[in-house]
Swiss-Prot record:
Substrate binds at residues 14, 16, 170, 279. Its EC number is 3.5.4.4. CDD domains: ADA. One of its GO terms (molecular function) is 2'-deoxyadenosine deaminase activity. One of its GO terms (biological process) is inosine biosynthetic process. Binds 1 zinc ion per subunit. This is Adenosine deaminase. Belongs to the metallo-dependent hydrolases superfamily. Adenosine and AMP deaminases family. Adenosine deaminase subfamily. It comes from Shigella dysenteriae serotype 1 (strain Sd197). Its cofactor is Zn(2+).
Length: 333
């Protein structure tokens, strides 16, 4: 189902949601951190989704053990490097990794700006080693409030040339986008792209707000757009992309089953929607699974899956020249 003549991308992928269970074990031992289990087999139920979670907030708790072992900036650098290694192993040509440095820093009071620098270093080294192209998206974790998000924003701005876009993630219902208008104004002033998690836990009004008030060029998840025909028309007309994450939306109980996922409808409506993983380490999936198992189960035809793959590159925060070069590089192989 993957067209090997086209670039394979993953543009909605959380770096801090893709910490290997084996790495969690090893860092736990290295830093003498108490874990809920002491073998890979017994640890996995604590760090990966085994059964669907009742809601988004419950799902997010599965990420916590991964960041609890980030006891140093070297640990942050390691997981960033391993994220690129994982991307290469699964055949990705281009990946946009998003991360919340405040979340990664929290368990061991690491300097937030230091986490940003460590992630940049790890990703740069990974790209050099494995030949994958990557860009970084800074996440503000709305769940921690406006002041904490301000701290994250300042850390990103200190490395503004290495950050491509700003995102807002976390408890969408409890912390609406309206709380973060000034943050996004500064992001746009810095010349960054904007993508926002919206329409996952909250309704279509959250997507409208992300676009109109925060300046979103892309929407993360966006499943609730299906409830608003005018919104779907607007997304298609304005070419505002939806970063679809099929398995994730089932595991968070955002969508009841893959057959009910709106991605097929979005594509039929002319919306620029792509296929992505979200938190592959926590979900126990990879991009190949999303294309070859999840997408067909969501009712997508072979041509629709190919269109979603094309959309992934078209939606990417790359220049026209960078996209052309990537297409040519893959075609030459």
């Amino acid at each position: 189902m993957i067209d090997t003549t086209l670039p394979l991308t993953d543009i909605h992928r959380h770096l801090d949601g893709n910490i290997r269970p084996q790495t969690i074990l090893e860092l736990g031992r290295q830093y003498n951190i108490s874990l809920p289990a002491h073998s890979l087999e017994t640890l996995i139920p604590h760090v990966q989704v085994i059964a669907n979670e009742p809601d988004l907030v419950s799902f997010l708790t599965k990420l916590d053990w991964g960041v609890k072992v980030l006891a140093s900036l070297d640990a942050c650098r390691r997981v960033a490097f391993e994220n690129i290694e994982d991307a290469a192993r699964h055949g990705l040509h281009y990946v946009e990794l998003r991360f919340s440095p405040g979340y990664m820093a929290m368990a061991h009071q690491l300097p937030v700006a230091g986490v940003v620098e460590a992630v940049i270093d790890g990703v740069r080294e990974g790209c050099r080693t494995f030949g994958v192209q990557a860009k970084l998206i800074g996440i503000m974790s709305r769940t921690f409030g406006e002041a904490a998000c301000q701290q994250e924003l300042e850390a990103f701005l200190a490395h503004r040339d290495q950050i491509t876009a700003l995102d807002l993630a976390g408890d969408e219902l409890g912390f609406p986008g309206s709380l973060f208008l000034s943050h996004f104004n500064r992001a746009r002033d810095a010349g960054w792209h904007i993508t926002v998690h919206a329409g996952e836990a909250a309704g279509p009004e959250s997507i409208w707000q992300a676009i109109r008030e925060l300046g979103a060029e892309r929407i993360g998840h966006g499943v609730k757009a299906i409830e608003d025909r005018a919104l779907m028309d607007f997304l298609a007309e304005q070419q505002i992309g939806i970063e679809s994450c099929l398995t994730s939306n089932i595991q968070t109980s955002t969508v009841a089953e893959l057959a009910a996922h709106p991605l097929k409808t979005f594509l039929e409506h002319g919306i620029r929607a792509s296929i992505n993983t979200d938190d592959p380490g926590v979900q126990g999936v990879d991009i190949i699974h999303e294309y070859t198992v999840a997408a067909p189960a969501a009712g997508l035809s072979r041509e629709q899956i190919r269109q979603a793959q094309i959309n992934g590159l078209e939606m990417a925060f790359l220049s026209a020249e960078e996209k052309r070069a990537l297409r040519e590089k893959v075609a030459a192989k």
